[in-house]
Protein backbone atom coordinates (compact mmCIF):
# COMPACT_ATOMS: atom_id res chain seq x y z
CA UNK A 1 0.00 0.00 0.00
CA UNK A 2 2.22 2.86 1.24
CA UNK A 3 4.58 3.92 3.99
CA UNK A 4 2.60 5.62 6.76
CA UNK A 5 5.66 7.67 7.74
CA UNK A 6 5.46 9.55 4.43
CA UNK A 7 1.86 10.74 4.82
CA UNK A 8 2.78 14.31 5.72
CA UNK A 9 4.64 14.56 2.40
CA UNK A 10 1.47 13.73 0.47
CA UNK A 11 -0.42 16.93 1.26
CA UNK A 12 -1.23 18.77 -1.96
CA UNK A 13 -0.75 15.72 -4.20
CA UNK A 14 -3.37 15.28 -6.90
CA UNK A 15 -5.81 12.50 -6.06
CA UNK A 16 -7.00 10.46 -9.02
CA UNK A 17 -9.69 7.83 -9.33
CA UNK A 18 -9.27 4.24 -10.43
CA UNK A 19 -9.32 5.33 -14.10
CA UNK A 20 -6.89 8.23 -13.66
CA UNK A 21 -9.54 10.99 -13.54
CA UNK A 22 -8.55 13.84 -11.25
CA UNK A 23 -10.73 14.16 -8.15
CA UNK A 24 -8.87 16.99 -6.41
CA UNK A 25 -5.90 17.64 -4.12
CA UNK A 26 -5.07 15.78 -0.93
CA UNK A 27 -5.69 17.84 2.18
CA UNK A 28 -5.46 15.47 5.18
CA UNK A 29 -5.46 11.84 6.24
CA UNK A 30 -7.81 10.37 8.85
CA UNK A 31 -6.72 7.34 10.85
CA UNK A 32 -8.80 4.64 12.50
CA UNK A 33 -8.39 5.43 16.20
CA UNK A 34 -8.45 1.73 17.15
CA UNK A 35 -5.92 0.41 14.63
CA UNK A 36 -3.91 3.56 13.80
CA UNK A 37 -4.27 2.64 10.12
CA UNK A 38 -4.85 5.40 7.54
CA UNK A 39 -8.51 4.98 6.59
CA UNK A 40 -9.79 8.06 4.74
CA UNK A 41 -8.30 11.09 3.03
CA UNK A 42 -9.93 14.45 2.59
CA UNK A 43 -9.66 15.77 -0.94
CA UNK A 44 -10.24 19.40 -1.85
CA UNK A 45 -12.73 19.70 -4.71
CA UNK A 46 -14.36 22.72 -6.28
CA UNK A 47 -13.17 26.11 -7.41
CA UNK A 48 -9.98 27.76 -6.13
CA UNK A 49 -10.67 29.98 -3.15
CA UNK A 50 -13.71 27.91 -2.24
CA UNK A 51 -14.68 24.32 -2.54
CA UNK A 52 -15.08 21.62 0.05
CA UNK A 53 -13.31 18.58 1.40
CA UNK A 54 -14.72 15.16 0.46
CA UNK A 55 -13.79 11.93 2.19
CA UNK A 56 -12.36 9.07 0.11
CA UNK A 57 -11.31 5.65 1.44
CA UNK A 58 -7.64 4.73 1.40
CA UNK A 59 -8.14 0.95 1.27
CA UNK A 60 -6.41 -0.22 -1.90
CA UNK A 61 -4.91 3.23 -2.60
CA UNK A 62 -1.50 3.59 -4.22
CA UNK A 63 0.81 6.56 -3.89
CA UNK A 64 3.43 7.70 -6.39
CA UNK A 65 5.62 10.80 -6.49
CA UNK A 66 3.05 12.52 -8.72
CA UNK A 67 -0.35 11.44 -7.33
CA UNK A 68 -2.43 9.32 -4.98
CA UNK A 69 -4.67 6.81 -6.80
CA UNK A 70 -7.80 5.63 -4.97
CA UNK A 71 -10.01 2.73 -6.02
CA UNK A 72 -13.30 4.65 -6.10
CA UNK A 73 -14.58 6.47 -9.17
CA UNK A 74 -14.64 10.26 -9.46
CA UNK A 75 -18.43 10.60 -9.26
CA UNK A 76 -18.70 8.50 -6.10
CA UNK A 77 -15.89 10.50 -4.51
CA UNK A 78 -17.39 13.88 -5.42
CA UNK A 79 -20.81 12.79 -4.10
CA UNK A 80 -19.25 11.73 -0.77
CA UNK A 81 -19.99 13.44 2.54
CA UNK A 82 -17.94 16.60 2.90
CA UNK A 83 -16.89 19.38 5.23
CA UNK A 84 -15.92 22.98 4.52
CA UNK A 85 -12.28 23.69 3.80
CA UNK A 86 -11.96 25.16 7.30
CA UNK A 87 -14.33 22.62 8.85
CA UNK A 88 -13.85 19.78 11.26
CA UNK A 89 -15.44 16.36 11.05
CA UNK A 90 -18.13 16.03 13.71
CA UNK A 91 -18.52 12.63 15.40
CA UNK A 92 -22.09 12.47 14.09
CA UNK A 93 -20.75 12.63 10.51
CA UNK A 94 -18.59 9.53 10.74
CA UNK A 95 -21.34 6.93 10.08
CA UNK A 96 -22.38 8.74 6.88
CA UNK A 97 -18.86 8.59 5.48
CA UNK A 98 -18.57 4.86 6.05
CA UNK A 99 -22.12 4.28 4.78
CA UNK A 100 -21.53 6.22 1.54
CA UNK A 101 -18.90 3.65 0.57
CA UNK A 102 -20.83 0.63 1.92
CA UNK A 103 -18.41 0.15 4.81
CA UNK A 104 -19.38 -1.00 8.30
CA UNK A 105 -19.19 1.60 11.04
CA UNK A 106 -18.81 0.85 14.73
CA UNK A 107 -17.89 3.27 17.48
CA UNK A 108 -15.10 2.27 19.84
CA UNK A 109 -15.75 -0.02 22.80
CA UNK A 110 -16.09 3.00 25.09
CA UNK A 111 -18.04 5.11 22.60
CA UNK A 112 -14.96 6.92 21.27
CA UNK A 113 -14.73 8.32 17.77
CA UNK A 114 -13.55 6.09 15.00
CA UNK A 115 -11.60 8.66 12.94
CA UNK A 116 -8.80 11.02 13.92
CA UNK A 117 -7.02 13.50 11.64
CA UNK A 118 -3.26 13.81 11.32
Residue ranges and their predicted role:
Residues 1-118:
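Peripheral interaction segments used for macromolecular assembly
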